[in-house]
Amino acid sequence: MLKVFNTMTRQKETFEPITPGVVNMYVCGPTVYNYIHIGNARSAIAFDTIRRYFEYRGYQVKYVSNFTDVDDKMINEANKEGITVPELGDRFIAAFKEDTAALNIEPATVNPRATEHINEIIEFVQDLIDKDYAYPVDGDVYYRAHKFSHYGELAHLNLDDLEEGASQHTNDEETARKEDPVDFALWKGAKPGEISWPSPWGAGRPGWHIECSVMSTHYLGETFDIHGGGEDLIFPHHQNEIAQSEAKTGKTFVHYWLHNGFVTIGDDNEKMSKSLGNFVTVHDILKTVDPQTLRFFMSTTQYRRPIQYTQQNLDTAERNLERLQTAYDNMGYRLKDAEAGNDPKVEQETRQIVADYIDAMDDDFNVQNGIAKVHELARLGNVYAERPVVFAGTLDFIRQTLSDLLSVFGIKFAAAATLDDDRIQALIDERLAARKSRDFLRSDEIREQLKSQGIILEDTPQGTRWRKEN
């Protein structure tokens, strides 16, 4: 029974989709004024892993993730570069697709742009005005937060406290136009030189929150299963989406709210931010880090937990991924001399590991326990491959199962590659270092990795030599 942690109720709940066998989910995408940073990647990878697990369990998933392609950041960056907002958006949407493809993130079913839905946004805002949930002021339109009785519920915040905080942080000019400091913009009147669209309230552009309400309900309906995003979006963004959408439809907007944790940088666990100078883009990281390593590192931490981005943690992820690859290669190597047939006992052990894996992942996508079962299966495969007599059917079964479980994390096994002399020597040097540090497990893994690719090591008093298998 699959359970998810619902931010709205602050507890794990049994997942029951609106339509049996179908999951409709919306995840807030990036504002496309720059390359995505690792915080954006963390969210994209976390929810891609969740999506993949739903698909592994047999669900049909409709996955919608938007591009915010008009807002203050977009306008400021476009003006700085002397280009149009659409030109800026096109450039970084293309960059987003390139980065996410490198990380093996499945394309969304739909990737809507806010600017593709301006007419719907205007109609949505007008409906809120007609229902007295919104009011126009000098070309802007604001939402009456106090009129929505559940405002603040998602973040478990009190409206009175929010009003006090908003009055302290809102600029005087904007506060003077609002009925209440906590009211928020649905439509922003155009300033000179800004991109804008005509509306009943004058030329302007949509507010950030209304964009997601319109796009999510357009593609998934007035009520859908899952809404996801980073925990920094709980308030005000997701709370405002709820207020807008439920005021318009009178229906529950979303059944399950899922939020991923932050990324911290370095050994000091600093939260990533531009002001601290530790802002890191995926575009830059992938110049020096293998995409599969970054993907594996980020997808094997439970989505609600923070991730500590350090070189040491990346190195650990790389080693763990190499161990899994080595096990996969070892079994592939033994297929050459395997006998026809199956080993029912070993295959039953494999099925039990899969059952345990599902139990782990059904518990709010507990990837730490899930990946532990993947490693357990790899060990089973390694041990079986060392037997004098092995059966091809069983080797194939374990290898395919290992591949299937790991694919949930967005990882693909590499085909056995031809090693050049430099790579062989690098692995021999790594094996020597492992033996000196008494890491005999890693030493043996390297020997088996090379053996699986036809390279035989011979330890002599003069050092380690290698030869190609005849």
From Swiss-Prot:
Zn(2+) binds at C28, C212, H237, E241. InterPro entries: Cys-tRNA-ligase, Cys-tRNA-synt_Ia_DALR, Cys-tRNA/MSH_ligase, CysS_C, Rossmann-like_a/b/a_fold, tRNA-synt_1_cat_dom, tRNAsynth_Ia_anticodon-bd. It catalyses: tRNA(Cys) + L-cysteine + ATP = L-cysteinyl-tRNA(Cys) + AMP + diphosphate. ATP binds at K274. Disulfide bonds: none annotated. GO terms for cellular component: cytosol. Transmembrane segments: none annotated. A motif ('KMSKS' region) lies at residues 271-275. Pfam families: CysS_C, DALR_2, tRNA-synt_1e. A motif ('HIGH' region) lies at residues 30-40. It is found in: Cytoplasm. Its cofactor is Zn(2+). Its EC number is 6.1.1.16. Its main location: cytoplasm. Binds 1 zinc ion per subunit. GO terms for molecular function: ATP binding; cysteine-tRNA ligase activity; zinc ion binding. HAMAP family: Cys_tRNA_synth. Monomer. Belongs to the class-I aminoacyl-tRNA synthetase family. This is Cysteine--tRNA ligase.
